[in-house]
């Protein structure tokens, strides 16, 4: 859907692009008699190995679950430190904290909102066990430089690729090597309502992740050879129940087939916004300097009151009154109650400046050109108020 009329009702910040194909995929699973983890999970994992070029893929119930068991598999715990930007979804910091480790929050580049190799390296101590860079809003972080730091210091790198299905860095899909975690949450570029997936080139890590995601058993929830759980399965280590159902996996597979089309439409809307914003005081994010393909998970503007004549919160409220939804990605983690009290002296100037000004505009594949024009017209009316 490219042209068309604007939505007559409220234009949400995001909406999943679901069609008859997803309904048919769910129907097929329901009629198969195997509705929990099964062949659709295996197909999804194989498809992500093909997409990324990585060796192993492990489907899980959410990206948060994936982060939890990845940190556990790396034996991160009390006394350890994990470097992460503060400008990220709080689940990463929560998982680090729940394992007894310390999140070491670092600043981001002011205009791309990417964590920088320099910020990461300056935060390394003898206690650092992992680095978690975020591929933010659909653009890639400078992962070669970050991975080189990890290799130099012997520190694991876990890529937060929740925004990065369809993101390419120097000609390769994010997650082509190392370990990366993707999200299939409802607002993501492909979705199955809730779900996630880990890719890795570490066979031992992959084996541990499969155990940890399913009760610590020595097999996955489904085994192709026995058409069910092997009867000799036993607990090898305490684990969780983070497996993905085949209902969800079937939806994700169907969405993955549409990925190029879905992301092309996102790119068209983003270009429409970019052209209009050139004449407005609202500041979009800068694009990374390295070669990349942007997945346009989010389209973010910065609303500086002195420059724009209106505050971010006032703009979001005014857009809501005009029938337009917005998002905030993210409120800096270190400014939120628990982390503010835990790290009261932490100052991250670029993160804080942006956290007070960022606003995510509506961006989803089923938006029409008229929908985007509606947003642009509202921004034009509100600029300078």
Curated annotation (Swiss-Prot):
Its cofactor is pyridoxal 5'-phosphate. Homodimer. The modification N6-(pyridoxal phosphate)lysine is found at residue 188. This is UDP-4-amino-4-deoxy-L-arabinose--oxoglutarate aminotransferase. SUPFAM superfamilies: PLP-dependent transferases. InterPro entries: ArnB_NH2Trfase, DegT/StrS_aminotransferase, PyrdxlP-dep_Trfase, PyrdxlP-dep_Trfase_major, PyrdxlP-dep_Trfase_small. The gene is arnB. GO terms for cellular component: cytoplasm; membrane. GO terms for biological process: lipid A biosynthetic process; lipopolysaccharide biosynthetic process; polysaccharide biosynthetic process; response to antibiotic. It holds the Pfam family DegT_DnrJ_EryC1. Signal peptide: none annotated. Belongs to the DegT/DnrJ/EryC1 family. ArnB subfamily. Keywords: Aminotransferase, Antibiotic resistance, Lipid A biosynthesis, Lipid biosynthesis, Lipid metabolism, Lipopolysaccharide biosynthesis, Pyridoxal phosphate, Transferase.
């Amino acid at each position: 859907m490219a042209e068309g009329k604007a939505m007559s009702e409220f234009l949400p910040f995001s909406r999943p692009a679901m069609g008859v194909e997803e309904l048919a995929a769910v129907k097929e699973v329901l009629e198969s008699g195997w509705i929990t983890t099964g062949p659709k999970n295996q197909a999804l994992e194989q498809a992500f190995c093909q997409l990324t070029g990585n060796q192993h893929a492990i489907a899980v119930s959410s990206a948060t679950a994936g982060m939890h068991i990845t940190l556990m598999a790396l034996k991160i715990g009390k006394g350890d430190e994990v470097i992460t930007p503060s400008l990220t979804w709080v689940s990463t910091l929560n998982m680090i904290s729940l394992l007894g480790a310390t999140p070491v929050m670092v600043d981001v580049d002011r205009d791309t909102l990417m964590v920088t190799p320099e910020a990461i390296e300056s935060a390394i101590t003898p206690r650092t066990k992992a680095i978690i860079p975020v591929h933010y809003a659909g653009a890639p972080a400078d992962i070669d430089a970050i991975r080189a730091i990890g290799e130099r210091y012997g520190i694991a790198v876990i890529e937060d690729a929740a925004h990065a299905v369809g993101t390419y860095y120097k000609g390769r899909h994010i997650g082509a090597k190392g370990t990366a975690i993707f999200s299939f949450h409802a607002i993501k570029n492909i979705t199955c309502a809730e779900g996630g997936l880990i890719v890795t080139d570490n066979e031992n890590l992959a084996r541990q992740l499969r155990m940890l995601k399913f009760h610590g058993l020595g097999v996955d929830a489904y085994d192709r050879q026995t058409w069910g759980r092997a009867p000799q399965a036993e607990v090898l280590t305490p684990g969780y129940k983070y497996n993905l159902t085949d209902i969800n996996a079937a939806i994700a597979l169907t969405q993955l087939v549409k990925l190029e089309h879905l992301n092309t439409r996102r790119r068209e809307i983003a270009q429409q916004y970019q052209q209009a914003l050139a004449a407005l005081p609202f500041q979009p994010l800068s694009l990374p300097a390295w070669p990349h393909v942007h997945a346009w998970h989010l389209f973010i503007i910065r609303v500086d009151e002195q420059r724009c004549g209106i505050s971010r919160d006032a703009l979001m409220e005014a857009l809501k009154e005009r029938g337009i939804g917005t998002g905030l990605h993210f409120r800096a983690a270190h400014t939120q109650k628990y982390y503010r009290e835990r790290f009261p002296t932490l100052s991250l100037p670029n993160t804080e400046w942006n956290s007070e000004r960022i606003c995510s505009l509506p961006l989803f594949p089923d938006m029409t050109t008229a929908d985007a024009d509606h947003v642009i017209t509202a921004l034009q009316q509100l600029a300078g108020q």
